[in-house]
């Protein structure tokens, strides 16, 4: 059945900012959808609030709106663009919920917009827990015994009926948000309360606990002729109880019998038909009892999901692309398989290799968070590996996580019987470190029966891990490493580093092991992902390594450039770096063969048809060097780009160069120069530029001496960090003592000598009340091109990745911008930059300070590119390949005159706001971790507000980042520190003028009273200074108060917005309870005066209700006209 001819234009809704449970996989699926629609001659209208996405590039759609995914905004875009259809199944839960809201508001009917990909009824049946249960029953399948609740009273009645443990699953949420396993009434009330709150329909499913069962997933697709294919079965190594996003998963399934698999297939096909998904795909999760084989259907997603991206990359079967074609009316047998070019999409993929996905976590960013893995997803990223067997695949995946000690290690003494007993107790609870603890227990002598009893991980997987340990012990104890034994180690997934450690050679022994391996002629070969287990030839070069006999690499003629990706998403290194890598691939592909190396299944860069060759491999020195050596034999290689993928590839630069690999762009020596305190200090001295006073310290005594010389407050951090890891603002000696004690405790015991750290702490003067600025620029050795000057909304002290910022800057003078331009030129010249550089500055009392410089792509490059209409990363890639800025001006990649540092009258304003994952991270007793922002980055994603002025743009950024955006009336609670009290009267008067009622603690209320401003007094909550914020609180009843504290008022829904600026770190726990309650209630809250002042401007803009809705194509045209007029 050919495609429908009545659909001429389609609106695609993206997934918005990167959050836990909904990450880069939806940029991948949305990008595929846009490409397919445009290939089919359909006009594409795209809406997404995330600027760090390839799908929001202007060439991906005819009209691209970087706007909040909110019903009023979506209606304005629909009214303007009049699409024939809406495709919501490729933007995750956000897009699905937005489509449902548009349907319920009557917008789709009003503008005659048809929903394609899945009907409202199908979405409802798949997402509504009660309706889905009926579908499962009608399919002849079984659900866990369950009931629906909309209140805690209903929850209690269900608990009486079923008993404990119970699983709580909210309707219409993603990543298991608000879900959990309750073992008693207290846990049930906490989890179910959160679930009802986070469900848009205030609905939770309470079901019998099935912890310990085996968990499986099926990815299915169905067309309008009722053809159904199972794209990929996936098995979770962790049993039911751990969210699939937090579990190690594998394909194909290893522990299902053929009969069980056929039964899952039959149930899955019946369910996709019963739900009514007839032009797209879905994901269905199952539980199988390990002893009886009883099958229970857990849930389904009637859309492209996180697992869809994994299944696509695992098999080479492009689910999002095919789902889009099905939504247009094609049938599976009419769609060609891109990889084979000779089989239709109705042929189910077959794989002859093993795929393993390992999650990456960020608990270190959230002190106090409960590290237990449950049904609510907590991982921030994932890595995938392909190999010839499970052991090799697991080893590759674990080292792909790019986290210290994430691979198995056998360092130190063999665990004692006492330690084994402790480890067996520890692995009862699933955590990030469970598999490392499990391996140590096995090394120490734990039996398979003991490990199975503790974890309920299927014995087949445990046997494989036992075999890895057995091989490791053979390597450790052998007299010599024979070719046979070394190959056995490689087949068991052991890296050269791991083998070196087993042989007692340490990290430095990696080169020795590699040289020995090469002497033996033992090198990996590269196999092709072909969707058909080699039954047909593959037309697309998509490779993975394994230790087999024959390589499938083919010779090439053009010179090649290898681009190293950023690996798994993490806080501090996310989708922004994949964006820059993809731009480099797109641009350099015009003149070179582009070779992409990455291990993240969520990203656009790992799409099989994005680059000329794709290697799905770990980003380690060993793996990258092997790829370079293999590619050299296939054709000429110009060099490797390490500047675009963040810290991961950057950290490999020096070693790759030393091994003879040409590094394109800024040299490793120049990268080190910018990160070396003394050398960079010389660059600044020569340029006559200021830096905050600083010192270094290896001990507490040295740290105190430096802090006293510099003067408190100081910013303390370890050497060489990404995302502000370990940074803290320290206000006194007592706090400094704690920081150094913690640093000593975290360092390896054998590296601490006489209370001295192995590497120095960096101590800087903290610039209080300074204006912080980010500058992104290009440099070719002679000419500088400013990509963007971004002014932070918060004062210095909040990590640049968490701070809101505006482009163009809103308060900087022409003279200040001139000084920033001159400073950036001097630094780029002094550091010998060839490509991108990011410099962070601060203005304090109009004195310019340089905070740091990074000679690489920064996380603000996509934002600056979208705000200025210039593809900075594409130009950077060409400069790294040897071209000049003048060349880029001539070829149209850069503006013919001027640059992104110029401000034009009438120019649109862009505001970037960060999105934080605090609601995901709770303490063991169920409270959210503290949200206070500081120098350590904690955000997972970002949004962009785009409008004619700062207030409107900031208002949009808040609407995009937080459900409902900013309130326009209601009650505001204010509690500020002593320093901020002098600014309080003006803020209070403005709030009154805007129609808000004020609530305050006694101290703040008394200040307001002196200025004739009345407020409602609430009781103060205080905790003992420097104690655990979980500690019991003392309630102080204030004279004239309403008899309640602010937490009680928040819980009663009587507070609409909060301003709570804390004092120094020691007393910051005072506001913890307030901030935790506000997070639980989804209230907008501000912890700095400057951001609250910005919010007041935005609230006034919201009240006018006159947002300007403009596509980025229209914006670029307007910007071009302004520049042409000016120059």
From Swiss-Prot:
Residues reported to bind Mn(2+) 1: 285, 299
Chain sites annotated for binding Mn(2+) 3? 840, 852
Q: What class of enzyme is it?
A: ligase
Q: Any notes on this protein's domains?
A: The large subunit is composed of 2 ATP-grasp domains that are involved in binding the 2 ATP molecules needed for carbamoyl phosphate synthesis. The N-terminal ATP-grasp domain (referred to as the carboxyphosphate synthetic component) catalyzes the ATP-dependent phosphorylation of hydrogencarbonate to carboxyphosphate and the subsequent nucleophilic attack by ammonia to form a carbamate intermediate.
SMART domains attached to this UniProt entry: CPSase_L_D3, MGS
The ranges of region (Carbamoyl phosphate synthetic domain) come to 552-962
**Residues that coordinate or bind Mg(2+) 4:** 852, 854
Q: Which residues bind ATP 1?
A: 129, 169, 175-176, 208, 210, 215, 241-243, 285, 299
PROSITE patterns for the chain = ATP_GRASP, CPSASE_1, CPSASE_2, MGS
Q: Where is the region Allosteric domain?
A: 963-1127
Q: Which GO terms describe its molecular function?
A: ATP binding; carbamoyl-phosphate synthase (ammonia) activity; carbamoyl-phosphate synthase (glutamine-hydrolyzing) activity; metal ion binding
Positions annotated to bind Mg(2+) 3: 840, 852
List, for all copies, the residue spans of the domain called ATP-grasp: 133-328, 681-881
Q: What is this protein called?
A: Carbamoyl phosphate synthase large chain
Per the entry, the cofactor note is: Binds 4 Mg(2+) or Mn(2+) ions per subunit.
Kindly list the cofactors needed.
Mg(2+); Mn(2+)
Q: Where do the annotations place Mn(2+) 4 binding?
A: 852, 854
Q: What range(s) does the MGS-like domain occupy?
A: 964-1127
Record's subunit section = Composed of two chains; the small (or glutamine) chain promotes the hydrolysis of glutamine to ammonia, which is used by the large (or ammonia) chain to synthesize carbamoyl phosphate. Tetramer of heterodimers (alpha,beta)4.
The signal peptide annotation in the UniProt record is: none
Residues that coordinate or bind Mg(2+) 2: 299, 301
> EC number(s) for this protein?
6.3.4.16, 6.3.5.5
Q: In which pathway does it act?
A: Amino-acid biosynthesis; L-arginine biosynthesis; carbamoyl phosphate from bicarbonate: step 1/1; Pyrimidine metabolism; UMP biosynthesis via de novo pathway; (S)-dihydroorotate from bicarbonate: step 1/3
Q: Which residues does Mg(2+) 1 bind?
A: 285, 299
Q: Which GO terms describe its cellular component?
A: cytoplasm
């Amino acid at each position: 059945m050919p495609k429908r001819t009545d659909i001429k234009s389609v609106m695609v809704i993206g997934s918005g900012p990167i959050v836990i449970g909904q990450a880069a996989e939806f940029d991948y699926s949305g990008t595929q959808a846009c490409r397919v629609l445009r290939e089919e001659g359909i006009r594409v209208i795209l809406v997404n609030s995330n600027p760090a996405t390839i799908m929001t590039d202007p060439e991906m759609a005819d009209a691209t709106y970087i706007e909040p995914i909110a019903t009023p905004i979506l209606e304005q875009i629909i009214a303007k663009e009049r699409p024939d259809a809406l495709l919501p199944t490729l933007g995750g839960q956000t897009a699905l919920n937005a489509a449902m809201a548009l349907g319920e508001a009557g917008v789709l009917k009003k503008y005659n917009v048809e929903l394609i990909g899945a009907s409202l009824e199908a979405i409802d049946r798949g997402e509504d827990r009660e309706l889905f249960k009926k579908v499962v029953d009608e399919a002849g399948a079984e659900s866990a015994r369950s009931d629906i609740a909309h209140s805690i009273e209903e929850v209690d009645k269900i608990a009486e009926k079923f008993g404990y443990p119970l699983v709580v699953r909210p309707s219409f949420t993603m990543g298991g948000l608000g879900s959990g396993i309750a073992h008693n009434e207290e846990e049930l009330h906490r989890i179910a309360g959160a679930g009802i709150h986070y469900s848009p329909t205030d609905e939770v499913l309470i079901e019998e606990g099935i912890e310990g069962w085996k968990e499986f997933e099926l990815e299915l697709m169905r067309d309008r002729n009722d053809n159904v294919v199972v794209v990929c079965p996936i098995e979770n190594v962790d049993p039911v109880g751990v969210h699939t996003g937090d579990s190690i998963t594998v394909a194909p399934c290893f522990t299902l019998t053929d009969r069980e698999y056929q039964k899952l297939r039959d149930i899955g096909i019946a369910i996709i038909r019963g739900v009514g998904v007839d032009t797209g795909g879905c994901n269905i999760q199952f539980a199988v009892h390990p002893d009886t084989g009883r099958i229970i259907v857990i849930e389904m997603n009637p859309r492209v999901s996180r697992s869809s991206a994994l299944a696509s990359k695992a098999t080479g079967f492009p689910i999002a692309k095919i789902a889009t074609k099905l939504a247009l009316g094609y049938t599976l047998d009419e769609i060609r398989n891109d990889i084979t070019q000779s089989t239709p999409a109705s042929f189910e993929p077959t794989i002859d290799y093993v795929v393993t996905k390992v999650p990456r976590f960020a608990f270190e960013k959230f002190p106090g968070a409960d590290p237990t893995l449950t049904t609510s997803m907590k991982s921030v990223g994932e890595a995938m590996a392909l190999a010839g067997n499970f052991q090799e695949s697991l080893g590759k995946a674990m080292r792909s996580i790019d986290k210290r000690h994430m691979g198995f290690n056998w360092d130190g003494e063999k665990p004692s019987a006492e330690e084994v007993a402790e480890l067996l107790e520890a692995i009862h609870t699933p955590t990030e470190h469970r598999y490392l603890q499990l391996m140590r227990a096995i090394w120490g002598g734990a039996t398979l029966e003991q490990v199975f009893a503790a974890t309920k991980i299927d014995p087949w997987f445990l046997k494989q891990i036992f075999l890895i340990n057995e091989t490791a012990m053979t390597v450790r104890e052998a007299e010599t490493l024979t070719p046979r034994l070394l190959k056995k180690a490689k087949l068991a997934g052991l890296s050269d580093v791991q083998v070196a450690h087993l042989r007692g050679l340490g990290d430095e022994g990696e080169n020795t092991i590699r040289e020995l391996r090469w002497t033996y002629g033992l090198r990996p070969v590269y196999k092709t992902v072909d969707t058909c287990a080699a039954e047909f030839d593959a037309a697309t070069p998509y490779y993975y390594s394994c230790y087999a006999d024959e390589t499938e690499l083919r010779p090439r003629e053009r010179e090649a450039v290898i681009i190293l990706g950023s690996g798994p998403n993490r806080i501090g290194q996310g989708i922004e770096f994949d964006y820059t890598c993809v731009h480099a691939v797109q641009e350099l592909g015009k003149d070179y063969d582009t070779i992409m190396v990455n291990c993240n299944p969520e990203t656009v860069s790992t799409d099989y048809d994005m680059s000329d060759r794709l290697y799905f491999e770990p980003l380690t020195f060993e793996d990258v060097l092997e790829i370079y050596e293999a590619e050299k034999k296939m054709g000429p290689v110009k060099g490797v780009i390490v500047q675009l993928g963040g810290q991961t590839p950057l950290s490999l630069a020096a070693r790759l160069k030393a091994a003879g690999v040409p590094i394109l762009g800024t040299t490793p020596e120049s990268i080190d120069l910018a990160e070396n305190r003394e050398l960079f200090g010389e660059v600044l001295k020569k340029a006559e530029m200021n830096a905050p006073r600083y010192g270094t310290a290896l001990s507490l005594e040295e740290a105190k001496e430096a802090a006293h010389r510099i003067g408190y407050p100081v910013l303390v951090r370890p050497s060489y960090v990404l995302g502000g890891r370990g940074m803290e603002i320290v206000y006194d000696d007592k706090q400094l003592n704690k920081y150094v004690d913690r640093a000593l405790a975290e360092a390896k015991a054998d590296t601490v000598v006489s209370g001295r750290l192995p590497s120095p702490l960096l101590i800087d003067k903290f610039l209080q009340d300074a204006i912080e600025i980010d500058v992104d620029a290009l440099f070719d050795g002679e000419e500088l091109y400013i990509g963007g000057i971004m002014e932070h909304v918060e004062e210095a002290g909040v990590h640049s990745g968490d701070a809101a910022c505006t482009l163009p800057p809103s308060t900087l003078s022409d003279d200040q911008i001139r000084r920033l331009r001159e400073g950036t030129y001097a630094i780029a010249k002094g550091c010998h930059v060839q490509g991108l550089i990011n410099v962070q500055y601060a203005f304090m009392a109009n004195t310019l300070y340089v905070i740091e410089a990074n000679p690489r792509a920064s996380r603000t490059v996509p934002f600056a590119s979208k705000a200025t209409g210039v593809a900075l990363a594409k130009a950077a890639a060409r400069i790294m390949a040897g071209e000049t800025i003048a060349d880029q001006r001539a070829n149209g990649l850069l503006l013919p005159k001027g640059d992104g540092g110029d401000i034009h009258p009438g120019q649109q304003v862009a505001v970037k706001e960060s999105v934080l994952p605090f609601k995901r991270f709770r303490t063991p007793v169920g409270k959210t971790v503290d949200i206070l922002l500081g120098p350590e980055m904690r955000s997972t994603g970002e949004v962009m507000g785009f409008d004619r002025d700062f207030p409107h743009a900031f208002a949009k950024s808040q609407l995009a980042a937080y459900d409902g955006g900013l309130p326009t009336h209601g009650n505001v609670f204010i509690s500020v520190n002593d320093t901020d009290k002098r600014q309080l009267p003006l803020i209070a008067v403005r709030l009154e003028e805007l129609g808000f009622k004020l609530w305050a603690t006694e101290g703040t209320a008394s200040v307001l009273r002196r200025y004739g401003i009345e407020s409602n007094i609430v009781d103060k909550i205080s905790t003992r200074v420097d104690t655990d914020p979980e500690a019991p609180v003392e309630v102080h009843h204030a004279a004239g108060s309403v008899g309640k504290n602010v937490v009680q008022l928040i819980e009663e829904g009587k507070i609409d917005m909060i301003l709570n600026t804390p004092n120094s770190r020691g007393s910051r726990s005072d506001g913890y309870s307030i901030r935790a309650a506000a997070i639980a209630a989804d209230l907008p809250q501000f912890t700095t005066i400057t951001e609250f002042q910005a919010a007041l401007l935005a609230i006034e803009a919201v009240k006018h209700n006159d947002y300007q809705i403009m596509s980025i194509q229209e914006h670029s045209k307007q910007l071009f006209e302004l520049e042409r007029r000016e120059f």
